Amino acid sequence: DALIGTLRDALGSEWSNTLVMVATEFGRTVAFNGTGGTDHGTASAAMLFSGALANGGNIVADWPGMKPSQLYEGRDLKPTMRFEQFASDALARHYALDPVKTRASLFPDFA
């Protein structure tokens, strides 16, 4: 909270023109492995920070659940959205761009 608050305060009125995306390139398994850690998994988490988010302060997600029957291949969180969709849709909404053209420009193999 302090990091984002400091960034917001430093940017002042430009905070509403700023979009910060945080994402990882891989998730983690739900279950612990033999050494008490977790292995690389399938689904991950991503966050947006901005002064202009329509749902600011809320968690917006399609939560698949963590019951064994809800896991991907019985061990990973089930993906509900590709990163390419998350990133291109966030940029398109924030900067009032056409989402189809934005996705095609940023991720031509995904469009």
Predicted segments with their positions:
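Feature marks hydrolase-like catalytic cores characterized by long aromatic- and Gly/Pro-rich stretches
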Residues: 1-111
